[in-house]
Amino acid sequence: MARQKQFKRKKNAINGWLVLDKPYGLTSNEALGKIKRIFSPQKVGHAGTLDPRASGLLPVAFGEATKTVPFVMDGRKVYRFEVTWGAETNTDDTEGEVIATSDVRPTADTISPVLSEFVGTIMQVPPKFSAVKVAGERAYDLARDGEEVVLEARPIDVHRLDLVDCPDDNRAVFEAECGKGTYVRALARDLGRRLGTCGHVTELRRLLVGPFGEEDLIELDEILETAEELEEGEGVDALVEEFVLPVREAMDELVEVPVSEDDAAKIRKGMAVLLRGRDAPLNTEVAFASHASVPVAIGSIEKGRFQPSRVFHL
């Protein structure tokens, strides 16, 4: 196996987003570790953990893009997942022990009519094996220690839940568009119960997070292969040009206010500026100022004045 090429001579000042297609079997932090070793960035993080048994979209933020992580994490997510009927597990996926079984196998005709009950703002009890905190401790830590975990139902937003396919009598494939805090494993569990059977997730893939979708996905192997093919002296800049999206991609849904070069300089010093122009917004809770299409700062607008809260160094 070829040794993985790395650029370790110095920490690289990289700013932007890499939309990684996380492979099945890796934790999100393991995938992030591989990206760190390839790019050697000064600062890096990810926006939204994926379970090891899930694959798909893992947004990776470099440098100044880490300041925009909350806008990505608060955005909508789309998941495609397979539910296997007839067994419920204590983890609500294939990793756990079977705790209930059923001979009932729902069909497309019985599944479709109940899906609307799971759309909108609904109450959901998270899986016992989840990162939800109970008295300051993670639920999965308590569950692994054999302690009885009782989690309260909490509101979640499901914008769309579609039946995609029924490959055979034992399985059904769904696609869900949902908000922050939704557990797809719990959705599968509750679907099974509502249909008079048991169910657990056997495949899970994330297709969208906030502004990033399938068209943005980059496979880890593609990055590794490109790194190996670089000519001597090309370094990490060639990888950044090939795979890293601009910081502003994460702020597509925010109000953008273009400012002059002089005002941009003031904003970078933390000063508020009066916005000019007939179309300038008067009041906005969250917006970002830009100059020459480059983000300057995130902030708020009150009575026509932009007040920065987080300044970009781009």
Model-assigned labels for residue ranges:
Residues 2-216, 298:
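RNA pseudouridine synthases
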